[in-house]
Amino acid sequence: GKPNRPRPAPIQPRPPHPRL
């Protein structure tokens, strides 16, 4: 069997930065 390729970490949504 083919070795499983390590999938990249899932992209997490950035927390909304406070608008100054």
Swiss-Prot record:
Give a yes or no for keyword Lipid biosynthesis in this entry: no
A GO CC annotation recorded here is: extracellular space
Describe what upregulates or represses it. By bacterial infection.
Question: Does the entry feature the keyword Secreted, yes or no?
Answer: yes
What top-level branch of life does the organism fall under? Answer: Eukaryota
What is the annotated localization of this protein?
Answer: Secreted
GO BP annotation list: defense response to Gram-negative bacterium; innate immune response
Keywords carried by this UniProt record: Antibiotic, Antimicrobial, Immunity, Innate immunity, Secreted
Q: Where is this region: Disordered?
A: 1-20
Q: What does this protein do?
A: Antimicrobial peptide active against many Gram-negative enterobacterial and plant-associated bacterial species. Not active against other bacterial species like H.pylori, P.mirabilis, B.pertussis or N.gonorrhoeae.
Family according to the record: Belongs to the apidaecin family.
Q: What is this protein called?
A: Apidaecin 1+
